[in-house]
Amino acid sequence: MSDEIVWQVINQSFCSHRIKAPNGQNFCRNEYNVTGLCTRQSCPLANSKYATVKCDNGKLYLYMKTPERAHTPAKLWERIKLSKNYTKALQQIDEHLLHWSKFFRHKCKQRFTKLTQVMITERRLALREEERHYVGVAPKVKRREQNRERKALVAAKIEKAIEKELMDRLKSGAYGDKPLNVDEKVWKKIMGQMEEENSQDEEEDWDEEEESDDGEVEYVADDGEGEYVDVDDLEKWLADSDREASSASESESDSESESDSDSDEENKNSAKRRKKGTSAKTKRPKVEIEYEEEHEVQNAEQEVAQ
C-alpha cells in the first residue's frame, strides 16, 4: 500500500531522479535503478523489495533490498560480491534471487552483462592509451637506440674474450704465483679450478696406467735354486781333484792350489754380490754370471785321461 502511494506521488508530481527525453520517454538517474527507465516496476523508491547490480571500485556487486530491513536505513541494502568468472556470477544471481520475480532475475543478469562489457572496454582503452606513448618514437631516436644496442653487444663479446684470455694467462702462470692487482676471491677461484683440473688429470693418468699394465711382460726372480750348481759343492769337487793331482807333481799342485784359492775367493765375492743384488732389486730380471778359468778345465781333462 505504501509502495503504491509513493509511486503515485512520483509519477503524478515531481521526482528529482527523473529525466524527460525529447521523444517523451522518461529516464531515471538513480544509481540503484536496474533498467534506467522511470517505470512502476523498475523504480527503486516505489518498491520495498528490489534487486540490482552495481559496480564499486572496479568490482561488481549484487544489491538486494527487502521490507524486513526498511526500518534500518544503514542496513537497507544487502551487498554480495560477484565472481570474476561470467558463468559463476550468473549462477550466484540465480541462487540469491531464486524466490524473486522473473523480472528482477532477468534484469539483474542483463545489467551484469552490460557492466562486464563496459569494464572490458575500459581496459582496452587504457591499454591503447599506454601503447600510444611508445608509438610516437622518432625514427632518428629509434636508429640511435639500435646502434647503441649493437655496440653494446660487440663490447660484451670483446669483454668476454678478454676475460677468457686473462683467465688462461693466470692459469698458465704468466703473472707469477699471485698477481698484486687481482682480487683474492678471483685468485682463490682460479686456484680451485686448477686443483680440480690437476686432480682430474691425475685420475686419468692413473686409469691409463692401469689400462697399460694389462698384458705387460715382467721378469721376476725364481725362488727355486735347484737348477744352479751350489758353490760349496763345486769347491769340494775342485779340492778333491787338486788332491789327486798333487801326487803327480808338487810344483803343479802348488800353482793349482793358489789358482784354486783365488778362484774360490772370486766365486764367493760374486755369490755375495748376486745375493745383495737380488735382495735390493727383486722386481728386475736376474742374471747370474759364472767365472771359469782354463787351467781348471785342463785339470779336469787330465783326470779324465788318467
UniProtKB/Swiss-Prot annotation:
<dbReference type="Pfam" id="PF04874">
    <property type="entry name" value="Mak16"/>
</dbReference>
<keyword id="KW-0131">Cell cycle</keyword>
<keyword id="KW-0539">Nucleus</keyword>
<feature type="compositionally biased region" description="Acidic residues">
    <location>
        <begin position="194"/>
        <end position="233"/>
    </location>
</feature>
<dbReference type="InterPro" id="IPR006958">
    <property type="entry name" value="Mak16"/>
</dbReference>
<dbReference type="GO" id="GO:0005730">
    <property type="term" value="C:nucleolus"/>
</dbReference>
<feature type="region of interest" description="Disordered">
    <location>
        <begin position="194"/>
        <end position="306"/>
    </location>
</feature>
<feature type="repeat" description="1">
    <location>
        <begin position="213"/>
        <end position="220"/>
    </location>
</feature>
<dbReference type="GO" id="GO:0042273">
    <property type="term" value="P:ribosomal large subunit biogenesis"/>
</dbReference>
<feature type="region of interest" description="7 X 2 AA repeats of S-[DE]">
    <location>
        <begin position="251"/>
        <end position="264"/>
    </location>
</feature>
<feature type="compositionally biased region" description="Acidic residues">
    <location>
        <begin position="251"/>
        <end position="265"/>
    </location>
</feature>
<dbReference type="GO" id="GO:0000460">
    <property type="term" value="P:maturation of 5.8S rRNA"/>
</dbReference>
<protein>
    <recommendedName>
        <fullName>Protein MAK16</fullName>
    </recommendedName>
</protein>
<dbReference type="GO" id="GO:0030687">
    <property type="term" value="C:preribosome, large subunit precursor"/>
</dbReference>
<keyword id="KW-0677">Repeat</keyword>
<dbReference type="GO" id="GO:0000470">
    <property type="term" value="P:maturation of LSU-rRNA"/>
</dbReference>
<comment type="similarity">
    <text>Belongs to the MAK16 family.</text>
</comment>
<feature type="compositionally biased region" description="Basic residues">
    <location>
        <begin position="270"/>
        <end position="284"/>
    </location>
</feature>
<dbReference type="GO" id="GO:0000463">
    <property type="term" value="P:maturation of LSU-rRNA from tricistronic rRNA transcript (SSU-rRNA, 5.8S rRNA, LSU-rRNA)"/>
</dbReference>
<feature type="compositionally biased region" description="Basic and acidic residues">
    <location>
        <begin position="234"/>
        <end position="245"/>
    </location>
</feature>
<feature type="repeat" description="2">
    <location>
        <begin position="222"/>
        <end position="229"/>
    </location>
</feature>
<dbReference type="InterPro" id="IPR029004">
    <property type="entry name" value="Ribosomal_eL28/Mak16"/>
</dbReference>
<comment type="function">
    <text>Its role might be as part of the apparatus concerned with the nuclear events of the cell cycle.</text>
</comment>
<feature type="short sequence motif" description="Nuclear localization signal">
    <location>
        <begin position="282"/>
        <end position="287"/>
    </location>
</feature>
<dbReference type="GO" id="GO:0000466">
    <property type="term" value="P:maturation of 5.8S rRNA from tricistronic rRNA transcript (SSU-rRNA, 5.8S rRNA, LSU-rRNA)"/>
</dbReference>
<feature type="short sequence motif" description="Nuclear localization signal">
    <location>
        <begin position="139"/>
        <end position="144"/>
    </location>
</feature>
<dbReference type="Pfam" id="PF01778">
    <property type="entry name" value="Ribosomal_L28e"/>
</dbReference>
<feature type="region of interest" description="2 X 8 AA repeats">
    <location>
        <begin position="213"/>
        <end position="229"/>
    </location>
</feature>
